[in-house]
């Protein structure tokens, strides 16, 4: 939840019956224009989702081609960002300019602002300490 309209404060919002409920497959953009305060603030999806220690924490699937990407991570969150502010600022394949929401970024991370949220893991790495996280992207065709 965003306390200052953009900063996470550690309050977790329920996703059931909201545009953030991806427990069942549906197109990412299917609900992106729904009347929801968080979508309006970000211009689309730019939100962290807490993940459980399961084999397939995030799955993208194209039912037309059968292409599938599965993501797993040892980090507690996956940030989903739907390129809400591209508006022709960079070019893609064959020089075609990318427009808003022409892509999606999936970023394994700690919860944003977790350094200030006591109940979340601290993200400070001190001199001499080591840290390891593993994120896997698996691609296949079904």
Please annotate each region the language model reported.
Residues 15, 20-142:
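Active-site pocket scaffolds in enzymes
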Residues 12:
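Catalytic His-Asp segment of secreted/periplasmic serine-dependent ester chemistry enzymes
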Residues 3-4:
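Short, small-residue-biased leader/transition segments that mark boundaries at the very start
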């Amino acid at each position: 939840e965003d306390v200052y309209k953009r900063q996470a404060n550690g309050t977790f919002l329920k996703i059931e019956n909201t545009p953030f409920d991806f427990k069942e497959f549906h197109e990412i953009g299917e609900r992106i224009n729904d009347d929801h305060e968080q979508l309006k603030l970000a211009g689309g999806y730019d939100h962290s989702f807490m993940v459980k220690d399961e084999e397939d924490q995030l799955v993208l699937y194209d039912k037309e081609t059968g292409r599938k990407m599965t993501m797993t991570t040892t980090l507690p969150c996956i940030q989903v960002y739907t390129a809400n502010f591209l508006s022709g600022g960079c070019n893609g394949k064959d020089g075609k300019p990318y427009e808003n929401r022409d892509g999606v970024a999936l970023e394994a991370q700690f919860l944003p602002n977790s350094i200030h949220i006591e109940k979340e893991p601290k993200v400070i790495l001190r001199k001499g300490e080591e840290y390891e996280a593993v994120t896997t992207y698996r691609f296949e065709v079904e």
